[in-house]
């Protein structure tokens, strides 16, 4: 009986360790970022199939290769980012529990896991089209080298540079089907590129003290909240004309885009009268998340019929 109990306890401990290790891995690859980028990748691919008149089920191999491949390169890039930033992540409340900081994942494990994931992802994208793999590589290079290693710790423009890499998933999805980049694909890229800047600036306001502690030159740290609020308004306003370039997808998508943009702009302007900037920044951040999810999912749903 005693031996049986010991064996059961040992088995439970092993299961807990496996669960913890899996959670640490998901934290390393920033699974939330991977999942959100799956939405935009799928939308780009779906619209390419829709406009080209191609069957979704008839191209299921391309769909799976693209979704898995893009997920792998994003996961790998995030792992490399965690490896590189481990020396500053312990200074910020938001990142101090990352497994590369706590020691649950060794630096070499994080680095080589990231490299392996990126390599596998690029191979899978190459099995769709060369262009998809090239764009995937550009996204990885921009995020890992231009953003993480170069601009993040040096320039306030880091947010703009990082937004380039975050905008390539729909291009990957599109080119995996088409092999070239159409007008709609470029509009999706521009929407995501511009969207990310007010999204991350709102987050930067919320986490200003974290970034200041880590000596990361985010806009609100260097120039203050008022300048950051004006920049947010400018970038949200830049989204206004983009839905008009999606007319080929139908009037409902154009109208939805305009309504989302107007709502975001109004909320942004309210920041100049808000007495609680942290509450306003949180509202802007949450709105941005809903904006991206609603608009990109709607593009798929509204083109089903």
Swiss-Prot record:
Any Gene Ontology CC annotation: plasma membrane
Family: Belongs to the UbiA prenyltransferase family. Protoheme IX farnesyltransferase subfamily.
Functional note: Converts heme B (protoheme IX) to heme O by substitution of the vinyl group on carbon 2 of heme B porphyrin ring with a hydroxyethyl farnesyl side group.
Compartments, as annotated in UniProt: Cell membrane
Transmembrane helix as UniProt keyword: yes
UniProt record, GO biological process: heme O biosynthetic process
Primary location recorded for the protein, binned into one broad class: membrane
Protein name: Protoheme IX farnesyltransferase 2
Species lineage: Bacteria, Bacillati, Bacillota, Bacilli, Bacillales
Top-level EC class: transferase
Domain of life: Bacteria
Organism whose genome encodes this protein: Bacillus subtilis (strain 168)
Assembly description: Interacts with CtaA.
GO terms of molecular function: protoheme IX farnesyltransferase activity
Keyword Transmembrane helix belongs to the record: yes
Membrane-spanning segments: 38-58, 60-80, 115-135, 157-177, 181-201, 227-247, 249-269, 285-305
């Amino acid at each position: 009986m005693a031996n049986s109990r010991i064996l059961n306890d040992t088995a439970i401990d092993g299961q807990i360790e496996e669960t913890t290790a899996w959670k640490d891995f998901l934290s390393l690859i920033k699974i939330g970022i991977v999942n959100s980028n799956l939405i935009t990748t799928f939308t780009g691919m779906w619209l390419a199939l829709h406009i080209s008149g191609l069957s979704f089920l008839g191209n299921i191999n391309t769909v799976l290769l693209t979704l898995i491949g893009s997920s792998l390169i994003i996961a790998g890039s995030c792992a490399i980012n965690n490896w590189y930033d481990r020396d500053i992540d312990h200074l910020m409340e938001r990142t101090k529990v990352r497994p590369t900081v706590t020691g649950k994942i060794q630096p070499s494990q994080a680095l080589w896991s990231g490299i392996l994931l990126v390599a596998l992802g690029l191979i899978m994208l190459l099995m769709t089209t060369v262009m998809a793999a090239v764009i995937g590589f550009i996204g990885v290079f921009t995020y890992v080298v231009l953003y993480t290693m170069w601009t993040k710790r040096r320039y306030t423009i880091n947010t703009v540079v990082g937004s380039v890499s975050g905008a390539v998933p729909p291009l990957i999805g599109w080119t995996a089907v088409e092999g070239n980049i159409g007008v709609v694909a470029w509009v999706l890229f521009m929407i995501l590129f511009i969207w990310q800047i007010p999204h991350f600036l709102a987050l930067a306001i919320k986490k200003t003290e974290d970034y200041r502690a880590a000596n990361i030159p985010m806009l609100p740290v260097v120039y203050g909240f008022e300048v950051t609020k004006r920049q947010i308004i400018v970038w949200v306003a830049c989204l206004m004309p983009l839905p008009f370039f999606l007319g080929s997808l139908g009037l409902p998508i154009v109208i939805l885009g305009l309504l989302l943009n107007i709502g975001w702009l109004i909320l942004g302007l309210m920041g100049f009268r808000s007495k609680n900037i942290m509450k306003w920044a949180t509202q802007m951040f949450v709105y941005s998340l809903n904006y991206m999810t609603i608009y990109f999912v709607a593009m798929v749903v509204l083109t089903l019929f």
